[in-house]
């Protein structure tokens, strides 16, 4: 027994340290409201699955775009991701929505997922290098839909009363600039929102400057998908080891990796809230919800019928 006691003490100390590192903030008053909703990923879009395919070089558009043939053959109107049409559809259907914001060269908040616009517009261009006026020439997936700014989206959810998950996309060291701009924009509306980011500096800024805002750490299994991160960054991000600095209200974790120890500690034993992304079937959404997690979904409408959108936007039988 004397031999095992030091080992037990060391293991207990390591476990206590891990719990300290990954612990969330608990008890935010807005969670009861957020838990009433499901969240449409980049709006309740309707687009071919080929729209998610990146060019070989993300900054250089394919000619023609990979989605061009499927969009032309679509039997229903295409509603691109992160478009006003997709957000309007989500709000009118009573869903919350998740969206992405980047800061343009002249300080506007563009609602678009990628920094490089080639995938969704078929044209070259980097969000952070363009002015808002230059954005006027870009269209999403060959439709008439423009890339919206955040202040165009917020009134839709202010009117519907359904919430938004605002993902802040940073570029280089602009985390404070883009976060403060997003918060200032949100302050001008009465839409119910929370903020998330892969960049823990965003959460640290919120903790120091706007602690009343619900904040969430986005993450995934970066050990499996490095995404250009150094090994040390991959270990820290995958295992939520920066939480002790940011104390997020929730973790938004990739659904397929939700069983990782750090996630289960933070969102199980330690009482943190959890979103799962991106859920592409009613089966996955139901499984997430049975586990007490909020779902961010796409490619189907969770109304009991499960409508799937495949090439060329054929609607699955009910």
Task: Pin down the residues of each PLM region.
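Phosphate-group recognition and catalysis centered on beta-loop-alpha active-site segments
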Residues: 2-318
């Amino acid at each position: 027994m004397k031999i095992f006691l030091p080992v037990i003490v060391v293991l207990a100390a390591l476990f206590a340290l891990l719990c300290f590192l990954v612990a969330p903030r608990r008890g935010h008053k807005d969670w009861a409201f957020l838990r009433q909703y499901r969240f449409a990923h980049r709006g309740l879009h309707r687009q071919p699955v080929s729209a998610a395919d990146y060019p070989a070089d993300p900054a250089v558009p394919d000619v023609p775009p990979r989605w061009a043939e499927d969009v032309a053959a679509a039997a229903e109107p295409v509603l691109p991701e992160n478009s006003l049409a997709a957000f309007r559809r989500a709000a009118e259907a009573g869903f919350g929505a998740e969206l992405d914001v980047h800061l343009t060269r002249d300080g506007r908040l563009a609602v678009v997922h990628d920094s490089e616009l080639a995938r969704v517009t078929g044209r070259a261009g980097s969000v952070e290098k363009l002015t808002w006026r230059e954005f006027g020439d870009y269209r999403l997936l060959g439709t008439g839909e423009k890339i919206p700014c955040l202040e165009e989206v917020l009134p839709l959810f202010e009117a519907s009363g359904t919430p938004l998950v605002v993902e802040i996309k940073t570029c280089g060291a602009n985390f404070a600039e883009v976060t403060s701009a997003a918060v200032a924009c949100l302050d001008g509306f009465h839409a119910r929102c929370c903020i998330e980011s892969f960049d823990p500096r965003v959460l640290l800024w919120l903790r120091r400057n706007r602690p009343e805002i619900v904040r969430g750490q986005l993450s995934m299994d970066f050990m499996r998908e490095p995404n250009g991160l150094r090994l040390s960054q991959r270990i820290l991000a995958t295992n939520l080891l920066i939480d002790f600095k940011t104390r997020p209200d929730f973790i938004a974790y990739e659904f397929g990796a939700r069983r990782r120890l750090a996630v289960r500690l933070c969102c199980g034993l330690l009482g943190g809230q959890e979103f799962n992304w991106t859920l592409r079937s009613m089966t996955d959404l139901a499984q997430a919800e049975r586990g007490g997690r909020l779902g961010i979904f796409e490619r189907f409408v969770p109304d009991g019928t499960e409508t799937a959108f495949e090439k060329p936007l054929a609607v699955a039988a009910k």
